[in-house]
Amino acid sequence: MSSPFPADTPSSNRPSNSSPPPSSIGAGFGSSSGLDSQIGSRLHFPSSSQPHVSNSQTGPFVNDSTQFSSQRLQTDGSATNDMEGNEPARSFKSRALNHVKKVDDVTGEKVREAFEQFLEDFSVQSTDTGEVEKVYRAQIEFMKIYDLNTIYIDYQHLSMRENGALAMAISEQYYRFLPFLQKGLRRVVRKYAPELLNTSDSLKRSEGDEGQADEDEQQDDDMNGSSLPRDSGSSAAPGNGTSAMATRSITTSTSPEQTERVFQISFFNLPTVHRIRDIRSEKIGSLLSISGTVTRTSEVRPELYKASFTCDMCRAIVDNVEQSFKYTEPTFCPNPSCENRAFWTLNVTRSRFLDWQKVRIQENANEIPTGSMPRTLDVILRGDSVERAKPGDRCKFTGVEIVVPDVTQLGLPGVKPSSTLDTRGISKTTEGLNSGVTGLRSLGVRDLTYKISFLACHVISIGSNIGASSPDANSNNRETELQMAANLQANNVYQDNERDQEVFLNSLSSDEINELKEMVKDEHIYDKLVRSIAPAVFGHEAVKKGILLQMLGGVHKSTVEGIKLRGDINICVVGDPSTSKSQFLKYVVGFAPRSVYTSGKASSAAGLTAAVVRDEEGGDYTIEAGALMLADNGICCIDEFDKMDISDQVAIHEAMEQQTISIAKAGIHATLNARTSILAAANPVGGRYNRKLSLRGNLNMTAPIMSRFDLFFVILDDCNEKIDTELASHIVDLHMKRDEAIEPPFSAEQLRRYIKYARTFKPILTKEARSYLVEKYKELRKDDAQGFSRSSYRITVRQLESMIRLSEAIARANCVDEITPSFIAEAYDLLRQSIIRVDVDDVEMDEEFDNIESQSHAASGNNDDNDDGTGSGVITSEPPADIEEGQSEATARPGTSEKKKTTVTYDKYVSMMNMIVRKIAEVDREGAEELTAVDIVDWYLLQKENDLGSLAEYWEERRLAFKVIKRLVKDRILMEIHGTRHNLRDLENEENENNKTVYVIHPNCEVLDQLEPQDSS
């Protein structure tokens, strides 16, 4: 006898024009007037997420079982009478009472037909060829070539059809019509690209299903062959026979939906982008776009999309069980003779899985109200949308707002959050009398363990479109965005800030390209770009140059060993209060893409780099991005950098130089990218900059972190009548005229497009530029050879790399591919101005250094006697009378026994040191007799003869020269030798050894290494 059971699975037997059973998540929205009367007939999935739990609710398969039961009751009355006394028969009759007629969603079918017509007929005229192209049919061919699953639909294209009725219907009730849209897409694909429907494992799965069916049939024959009678009229075991036939029929059936490809529809270019704070329950189920910054991403996991279960009691297979955002089993077995409601086994081979990823986004920094905490929202990505958003990306998501159970609250111990009656005012004596039955206290209590999530169908980074036109500019740009999205999916790459010039130019309109060409041809483009940076800030041209070069950046390189050399430029602005330091930071945050603003005092090491946190639902450890990761390929602005703790400053050492963040916590060992530029603002110690202290003395920063900054700008609040007048006029005009008071050469949009285009260049050094770069580095290095002055800034190899990065950025500003010596000269001036501009202390020398002069006079006097009055002692024998009287009066006073200090400027001290060291080195190279202090001073005064206007200046300069020589000996630049080297070799001349003191270069002195090349040149 033929089996009365349907050959297909119950869920696949649904009529083609019927609406699929909505889940409990979407059952409360999207109801049109035609469906409001049928709300009571809707089917629900079980509310429990636990498998193997008995549930009394009706399931999606009750329609098929009741249809079969009614047919059996009408056609086989004898069998019904025999089953009346059995328990399965009573259950069988109870199912027949729940007969519910399926509802045809007429509106959904109309939407499907309109969507199919839209995919087939919509066309756009191409600007290149002038021909009319059918956009979405061409995209289906593109999907077939690259084996893709997602089709991208422009919402503006939908609004052009049927006076926007189709777009409005999809926007308002997106969750309701999504199954119909997917069905319409499958019909169009089956018509124009049928080979795209089958996946690579369709044939394998079909063969596996046939083998599984044969195995199950043989197993049923072995179990029931000996006990079941062959007579069809026998009623000895009707239940077993029915179970066997149902098993064979259901097991061998394979639904077409079970093997077809799962297509996804991605809508983009919606007219309105909502903020996370604007998400409300009234928008549940509607299509909308939201914007936010990605802070955390989970790993990509498989999600059970359409499940296939096997009944553990009768071995019946149930396919296409929709999962309502949780593990959902069938409510009961479709076999009417089987009483199974809890025991199911998942068939992994027959089930369909999709890629799944959860992304947590946070409100953008410019959208957070003052004094409010930033809101967060979980976004669910499926299919081809996974791995599109990275931590730190400012993305725009298009999808539907859904409500899901808050699993984290359900699993917590203790009292569950719920709405209860406030009984604090009721007397305790009457509480027991009026309480009634205690079991009714929870009647009608509503659980509060739900939260709002966002199911996204499209995601795109907002930062990658900087410089492109607005979404509703013209259809050509929207088509370019659609093609870029398709290419992005095909290549499986994510566009960064250094994409190819051709791709960037294709995203611009013809007017924008012509405007960009005019800017490139301008001879004074560099100066105009500088004046366009922060136009509201008066002056500070050097700081504006540094910020412009920071946004342009250098070229990222990597060595043969794989070591990466950073191209980002780090800048620190130091200065007095009210010198526009924070205003520069605020401008960069609002102008540059992927920029993050933070304060050093309120930031920790984990908040700046990354933190390891535990996932609330899965319990796994995940990495939550910090400020540096959020600013990847951008700029991280850190205000009050000097207020940051030293331990927190150490945490960003690696990020500033290697541009990576290494984490070894909670079993996670990872190296994350932090390719960001740092723009820091710091106040000096004590509030105002102290000119008598060094740069390091004015800052609460360590030497390693100072060397990682490419540029230091010291802004001082000096009193200047002209500058103060211009500054006051600028501020007053800014308050009076607002934007009219500012006239930058280029607007913000023009500047963004130019910087975006300039970053596509990768300039290289020429041979002339290489030689010039080496010479300029030697000039920077020579003043800091030994670090003899505590006020000097240590010039290291990092400053050489800074000059290279600055030169590359200047070349990018001019849109050229080669670095010329003029670019290096500009970088050298900027680096020297930013670092060497710091005022240094005067060099102090004690009065005890005068003793060297008297000793030198005595030694020179003895030499004059031996040399018959020839030598330099003649000049120093008789000082002027007024100077001698002054010295005698000073020695007669009792208070003059204390040491007096003479100060000389640092520049003059360095100049005198260079002259003296060069002279002694020259004498040493020629092999002449060593010089005494008097010889050195006389030679120095001879060189300074034209600069001395009076005799008093002569004696003052002479006394200062002796003190400088003594200071050079103390600093171990010179070394005293008692007696000449020739006399030292002669051990018999012991008298001359004590009578003459000469000076030579100290063996450990490194100043000479910097001076000799200059002499040779």
Swiss-Prot record:
Catalyzed reactions: ATP + H2O = ADP + phosphate + H(+)
EC number: 3.6.4.12
Keywords, comma-separated and alphabetical: ATP-binding, Cell cycle, DNA replication, DNA-binding, Helicase, Hydrolase, Nucleotide-binding, Nucleus, Phosphoprotein
Region listing for Disordered, in residue ranges: 1-94, 200-257, 852-901
Composition-biased stretches (Acidic residues): 209-223
Motif (Arginine finger): 707-710
Compartments, record wording: Nucleus
Main localization (coarse): nucleus
SMART domains: MCM
UniProt-listed GO biological process terms: DNA replication; DNA replication initiation; DNA strand elongation involved in DNA replication; double-strand break repair via break-induced replication; mitotic DNA replication; pre-replicative complex assembly involved in nuclear cell cycle DNA replication; premeiotic DNA replication
InterPro entries recorded: MCM, MCM6, Mcm6_C, MCM_CS, MCM_dom, MCM_lid, MCM_N, MCM_OB
Domain of life assignment: Eukaryota
Protein's UniProt keywords contain Transmembrane helix: no
Sequence ranges of Polar residues compositional bias: 35-83, 224-257
A single MF term (Gene Ontology): ATP binding
Residue ranges annotated for the MCM domain, each copy included: 525-732
CDD domains reported in the protein's UniProt record: MCM6
Chain residues that bind ATP: G575, D576, P577, S578, T579, S580, K581, S582
Family as reported in the entry's similarity comment: Belongs to the MCM family.
Assembly, per entry: Component of the MCM2-7 complex. The complex forms a toroidal hexameric ring with the proposed subunit order MCM2-MCM6-MCM4-MCM7-MCM3-MCM5; loaded onto DNA, forms a head-head double hexamer. Interacts with MCM10.
Other notes: Present with 13400 molecules/cell in log phase SD medium. Early fractionation of eukaryotic MCM proteins yielded a variety of dimeric, trimeric and tetrameric complexes with unclear biological significance. Specifically a MCM467 subcomplex is shown to have in vitro helicase activity which is inhibited by the MCM2 subunit. The MCM2-7 hexamer is the proposed physiological active complex.
Known function: Acts as a component of the MCM2-7 complex (MCM complex) which is the putative replicative helicase essential for 'once per cell cycle' DNA replication initiation and elongation in eukaryotic cells. The active ATPase sites in the MCM2-7 ring are formed through the interaction surfaces of two neighboring subunits such that a critical structure of a conserved arginine finger motif is provided in trans relative to the ATP-binding site of the Walker A box of the adjacent subunit. The six ATPase active sites, however, are likely to contribute differentially to the complex helicase activity.
This protein's name: DNA replication licensing factor MCM6
Species per Swiss-Prot/TrEMBL record: Saccharomyces cerevisiae (strain ATCC 204508 / S288c)
Species classification: Eukaryota, Fungi, Dikarya, Ascomycota, Saccharomycotina
Chain's gene name: MCM6
